[in-house]
Amino acid sequence: MQSAAIAGGDMVIKPVNVIGGGLAGAEAAWQLAERGIPVKLWEMRPQIKTAVHRSENLAELVCSNSLKSNLADTAQGLLKNEMEKIGSLLLACARATQVPAGSALAVDRERFSALVTRRLQAHSRIEIIREEMTSIPGEGVSIIATGPLTSEKMFQEIAALGGDDNLYFYDAIAPSVTFNSLNQNKIFKASRYGKGSDDYYNCPLNREEYEKFWQELTAADIVEGHSIDQKDFFSGCMPVELIARRGLDTLRFGPMRPVGLTDPRTNQRAWAILQLRQENHEGTVFGMVGFQTRLRWKEQDRIFRMIPGLEAAEFIRYGVMHRNTYINSPRLLLPTLQNKNHPALFFAGQITGVEGYMESAATGILAGLNAARFVAGQELLVLSPLTMIGALVHFITSAAAEHFQPMNANFGILPALEQKIKDKKSRYQHYVERSQKEMCKISELFLEHVVKEF
């Protein structure tokens, strides 16, 4: 496969195909275009619709409006710091459209995706094609970033490269409610442990209320439609009813944990708490944190309204379940995110087995950078596993292929420190400092090899 040809002394650059206009595809297209490479960005919506997308915008957030922690001493904060150092488009757009969320970075999802779409449309080197790509291009350089809802035709194409057509799991999405429908007398504002401002609304339950809710939830009618086993769900999007079925207290130690939250009206900690997080700039819509579900909609109405404060809740979006596909990256990909047998073919995003918005975007950055270097005939970059992005890519490309499961950013995937540190906070800070030093070296390397014009 060739992406460039010499014609009359000038280099003619063939466009790189980026297949999929989600978070990873948007980042990959941007990185290529910023380095002088023309891009054809393929997005099947609105021609082909999905069960969870609500607009035609690129980089639409479908599960939650939270991009997780902003704190510098967290794995998610470190990931964001690294992404900003190498020029993330999505983080810039997220900062411009953020809404209050304590120490987390949350965005107005509609404004965010609209801004990303406008930035990509305005770039002179990016052509957005609103059609389904049903086959992998046989010539030139391509990046597959088709995401968790890869169309059946494209997934079969990918499977033919050596993937397994049974590699999939399910994501469940949490419901959203209107703020005006909440009972203000029963909820209170606070962020866990007082971190950040009081950006979350909290619905406290006493023991009796919690146990009645738990009983109804575990007996509720769910949407089947598929042969589903608990192992098919990534733990970060485990349906709340499945968590509840593991035991009476699993919710209290999971999404409904009350620790770090004191009700100012009673000066006491509740038995359990549901948190509501702002989802739009106006503060009119709030999401039920950690309440991804596959309950039938009538059951969601009935059971979730048992929670104090939600008795008259207006659900503007019910929780739903959808299939999330990914390839066996340890078998198929190099740490450059190239396919092992087809070096001009790159992969990025959740289809590689990373889990999370920022994780997907980060792989899009790396795939875009390496695709640009491939076009220019430069050496491709393998990020150090001492960095969070490098550790994430190292994990998905070197894990045991027989039991490969999706992974998100966390300190556990970083190499151990040379010196053992028992204190967790201090240990995490050392991880951050080590990664930042390594990232500075990598950032300089990027600058030395940036392809601006041919």
PLM feature spans:
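A glycine-rich dinucleotide-binding beta-alpha-beta segment and adjacent secondary-structure elements
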Residues: 288-354, 361-363, 381-398, 404-408, ...
